[in-house]
Design a protein with these regions (language model features):
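ATP-dependent adenylation/nucleotidyltransferase module used to activate substrates
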Residues: 2-136
Length: 136
């Protein structure tokens, strides 16, 4: 018995890139802003955006980031910039902002609740930073 479903990576890739181009056109935006963490999700997303040919800004935003993640993020950005002339990058170290925020709000004795709240805070700081770069 043969499997009639085959994975066609190039066809899927082209479909996603076309969808991104259509989305950008309909939204009347000139390009993409992608946060780069050093993980597979941001690497894939930024590569697909770069393949559109539209300006793609890769933003690294460490907050107490492991050096290995920072290195992976920088290596990915460097490789993208070599492959695609439409890729640019910025770095915004959010660690001082995060620490200032933590010092201005009450803590919690429940460590699990505190850790979740701080994880959400890191995500929102990064989101706000990406909105900033998209707006300028």
């Amino acid at each position: 018995m043969t499997n009639s479903t085959t994975f066609q990576a190039e066809k899927i890739n082209q479909h996603i890139v076309k969808w991104l181009l259509d989305y950008a056109t309909n939204a009347k935006v000139k390009g993409f802003v992608v946060g780069i963490s050093g993980g597979i999700d941001s690497a894939l997303t930024s590569t697909l955006c770069a393949q559109t040919g539209l300006p793609t800004l890769c933003v690294e935003m460490p907050i107490h980031q492991a050096e290995s993640h920072v290195n992976r993020a920088n290596e990915h950005i460097d490789q993208l910039k070599k492959r695609f002339p439409n890729v640019f990058n910025e770095r915004a170290d959010l660690t001082p902002i995060f620490e200032t925020f933590k010092n201005q709000v009450p803590s919690s004795e429940n460590e699990a609740v505190l850790n979740l709240s701080l994880a959400n805070t890191r995500a929102r700081l990064r989101m706000t930073t990406l909105y900033y770069f998209a707006g300028i």
